[in-house]
């Protein structure tokens, strides 16, 4: 692992396997018992891009109080079970010392994970320590990453899986310039409750079309220099909306990525979208009027160009018809319907052979 990775540093006894309450040692095969739902949860976490590292204190391992051979048999069986089911640990880190030995490797000290911290391997924002003891949470704090305290009743493996993979896809962007003051907030997994106010009634309606047909919630508040014209208001709103959508999508793992829409009323609107990470716009629509309501028709293409710049998407968008109002509305509606397909979560894999979007 040369680049930074999302790593789960997982305790063994009491987290992966049941810790015997009598002597706290898994030193016989008949004492080996997996924690509930640990294997399917770890498999799903691997699919979500997490690497697995086991980090465990084993008091007095290799001494008369805990002979190495007593540890090896159940530990090796556990590892064989995990491997046979597709669960792969990149590393198994073991501290064999007693607490009174005052070693540098015993959790919550950093000795066992020193190589990961100094080698630039850890994605600090997304890596997690998982364990049942306070020392595991202290290790997480010392590593400057998140800690989750495992408890089979209140925070078992099903809950941990949900916590780490079902993240709220929300974002808020505030953009303030000399011309505009804008706040855009989106929630990609909620619908309805849109609150849009840009000072341009027709533009508000078009933004609502994107959110409604896109199947997500949008709040958009804009204070712009409309006493001059609508250029900065529309351009900066598009930039803020594209940025908010990109931030809410996160690493894009599990999304559909692509979308295609072909709505047909009296206008034929076509939209093809790829959340590719690369901005590109192909736009084809002609208008016979300079304005529709309070919206300059020349700003329609500029809106979508600005949006593709910050969303970093490839967008092909066209519409043909006789009524400018309907043409513009069909463009926004088609984009919304296409965006709905592209942002829909369909699994856990990243939809790219390159490993990044």
From Swiss-Prot:
Q: Where is this region: Imidazoleglycerol-phosphate dehydratase?
A: 169-357
Q: What are the names of the required cofactors?
A: Mg(2+); Zn(2+)
Q: Provide the residue positions that the database annotates as binding Zn(2+).
A: 95, 97, 103, 105
Which GO BP terms sit in this record? L-histidine biosynthetic process
Residues reported in the UniProt entry to bind Mg(2+): 11, 13, 132
Record keywords: Amino-acid biosynthesis, Cytoplasm, Histidine biosynthesis, Hydrolase, Lyase, Magnesium, Metal-binding, Multifunctional enzyme, Zinc
State the protein's name.
Answer: Histidine biosynthesis bifunctional protein HisB
Q: Which organism is it from?
A: Vibrio parahaemolyticus serotype O3:K6 (strain RIMD 2210633)
Instruction: Recite the lineage of the species.
Output: Bacteria, Pseudomonadati, Pseudomonadota, Gammaproteobacteria, Vibrionales
Q: Give the gene symbol.
A: hisB
């Amino acid at each position: 692992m040369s680049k930074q990775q999302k790593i789960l540093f997982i305790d063994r006894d009491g987290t992966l396997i049941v810790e015997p309450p009598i002597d706290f040692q898994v030193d016989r095969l008949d004492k080996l018992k997996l924690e509930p739902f640990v294997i399917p949860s770890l498999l799903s976490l691997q699919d979500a891009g997490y690497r697995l590292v086991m980090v465990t204190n084993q008091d007095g391992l290799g001494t008369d109080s805990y002979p190495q051979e007593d540890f090896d048999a159940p530990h090796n069986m556990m590892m064989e079970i995990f491997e046979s089911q597709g669960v792969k640990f990149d590393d198994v880190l073991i501290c064999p010392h007693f607490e009174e030995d005052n070693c540098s490797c015993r959790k919550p000290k950093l000795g066992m994970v020193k190589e990961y911290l100094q080698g630039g391997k850890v994605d600090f924002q997304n890596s997690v320590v998982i364990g049942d003891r306070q020392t595991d949470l202290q290790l997480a704090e010392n590593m400057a990453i998140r800690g989750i305290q495992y408890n089979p009743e209140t925070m078992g493996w099903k809950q941990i899986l949900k916590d780490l993979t079902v993240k709220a896809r929300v974002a808020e962007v505030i953009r303030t310039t000399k011309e505009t003051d804008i706040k855009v907030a989106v929630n990609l997994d909620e619908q309805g409750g849109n609150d849009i106010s840009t000072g341009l009634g027709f533009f508000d309606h078009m933004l609502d079309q994107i959110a409604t047909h896109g199947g997500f919630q949008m709040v958009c508040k804009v204070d712009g220099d409309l006493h001059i014209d609508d250029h900065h208001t529309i351009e900066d709103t598009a930039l803020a909306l594209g940025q908010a959508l990109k931030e809410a999508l996160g690493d894009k793992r599990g999304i559909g990525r692509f979308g295609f829409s072909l709505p047909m009323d009296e206008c034929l609107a076509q939209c093809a979208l790829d959340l590719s990470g690369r901005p590109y716009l192909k736009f084809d629509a002609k208008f016979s009027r300079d304005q529709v309501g309070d919206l300059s028709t020349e700003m329609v293409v500029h809106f979508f160009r600005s949006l593709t710049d910050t969303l970093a998407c490839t967008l092909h968008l066209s519409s043909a018809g006789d009524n400018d109002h309907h043409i513009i509305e069909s463009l926004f509606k088609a984009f919304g319907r296409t965006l709905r397909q592209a942002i829909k979560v369909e699994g856990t894999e990243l939809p790219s052979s390159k490993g990044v979007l």
